[in-house]
Amino acid sequence: MSDTEYLARAEAVLASVERTVDAANDGDHDIDLERNGSVLTLTFENGSKIIINLQPPMKELWIAAKAGGFHYRFVDGEWRDTRTGTEFFSALTDYATQQAGLPITFRA
């Protein structure tokens, strides 16, 4: 994957996360969302955070959550955990639901 392709795919992920959080905040959620360059920080009512950032040199997306730190690489059309193979949006759904205390579903 070229650098241009990586950036387009990774930026699309961040945009999708932003749209999902905006929609969730229209409902029962209260999630603060801050974007600083290629870093997206979600802060939940209980003060916990999930940080998603781009890693262009490695062509990866990283998630830092209460559950730990996770690296994702684009494989066969999806962002997959480099250790477990878990799909990015599925994992983010689990981490955010745990930290928010309310269900929230992320999709590509």
Swiss-Prot record:
Iron among keywords: yes
Pfam families (alphabetical): Frataxin_Cyay
Record-linked SUPFAM superfamilies: Frataxin/Nqo15-like (SSF55387)
InterPro entries assigned: CyaY (IPR047584), Frataxin/CyaY (IPR002908), Frataxin/CyaY_sf (IPR036524), Frataxin_CS (IPR020895)
Source organism, top-level taxon: Bacteria
One of the record's GO cellular component terms: cytosol
CDD domains xref list: Frataxin (cd00503)
SMART domains: Frataxin_Cyay
Record keyword Cell wall biogenesis/degradation present: no
The protein, known as: Iron-sulfur cluster assembly protein CyaY
Single Gene Ontology MF annotation: ferrous iron binding
Organism listed in the record: Burkholderia ambifaria (strain MC40-6)
Function noted in UniProt: Involved in iron-sulfur (Fe-S) cluster assembly. May act as a regulator of Fe-S biogenesis.
Family per similarity comment: Belongs to the frataxin family.
Lineage, uppermost ranks: Bacteria, Pseudomonadati, Pseudomonadota, Betaproteobacteria, Burkholderiales
GO biological process: iron-sulfur cluster assembly
Keywords: Iron, Metal-binding
